[in-house]
Amino acid sequence: MSQLPTDFASLIKRFQFVSVLDSNPQTKVMSLLGTIDNKDAIITAEKTHFLFDETVRRPSQDGRSTPVLYNCENEYSCINGIQELKEITSNDIYYWGLSVIKQDMESNPTAKLNLIWPATPIHIKKYEQQNFHLVRETPEMYKRIVQPYIEEMCNNGRLKWVNNILYEGAESERVVYKDFSEENKDDGFLILPDMKWDGMNLDSLYLVAIVYRTDIKTIRDLRYSDRQWLINLNNKIRSIVPGCYNYAVHPDELRILVHYQPSYYHFHIHIVNIKHPGLGNSIAAGKAILLEDIIEMLNYLGPEGYMNKTITYAIGENHDLWKRGLEEELTKQLERDGIPKIPKIVNGFK
């Protein structure tokens, strides 16, 4: 029996819809659960941003260069690309309507698609709509609940895809920058586009830097002795990334941050255009921590660094850590804080 093709287009065509996991009208993102060849699959579709024919920089009075977006006369622009119009209503000087804009795979694609296949139950929980809670993770809670979970997530080949990128040349055509030598392996890292970025519009630039060090899974593993390493990383990122995009983005226009809890437990850094509002909670308080703040905080936490700090963050009910102990701990925290329990029946606001 011949093996079915596993290229992206063939897999998408074989996708059998099961349910909608999540739909966000603000970010224009929808996640669908389905199957491909009887194995679970997740497709995430995101509406692409409007594209301009060219982005350039022109010098301004303060010596900086400012972005100039032009060539909206392009046939695929949001003006000349209009093929159909339907007015919704108008009032005085205000008009509302719908339009169909000419699409082209290279110049003006409709959406960006991400596929996870085969998808694990952990993937499905991550993309499924869920309630979130703020929890205070103490050092004791980390060692008792979170650390065993992280160790489990780092075993059984769950990080194989990361090692493929670092050592096996996977996604090599997408790598923006690589700094690695056997002599200074622990200082090495590489930068590549995050799945959240369409790779075309710099306003939504979203990159990820993955380090070669394996002793750091999360910020919990950062000690005071790592402070200079983080400073060097931060400075290298701010020096390198602008040049990779012809200086259309400046060093001080990069939001450089770390997630806790991260989506995978190999230390990595998010690099986002400051114009980008983020998708979901990717740059929100309770998830994102600026690298500059991490570096500064290490000045005050002592030799053990973040291992001795209580960290407050948002956790979804679908996350395995919620049922492994964080839900119970949060209930205890609310009781200790004197926060009254929510009534079982709430009739509405008075």
Curated annotation (Swiss-Prot):
Subunit structure: Homodimer. Forms heterodimer with DCS2; the interaction inhibits the DCS1 scavenger decapping activity during post-diauxic growth.
PTM-bearing positions, type Phosphoserine: S60
Identification of the protein by name: m7GpppX diphosphatase
Positions that bind substrate: E171, K196, H259, Y260, Q261, P262, S263, Y264, Y265, H266, F267, H268, I269, H270
GO molecular function, one term: protein heterodimerization activity
Enzyme class label: hydrolase
GO BP term, pick one: response to osmotic stress
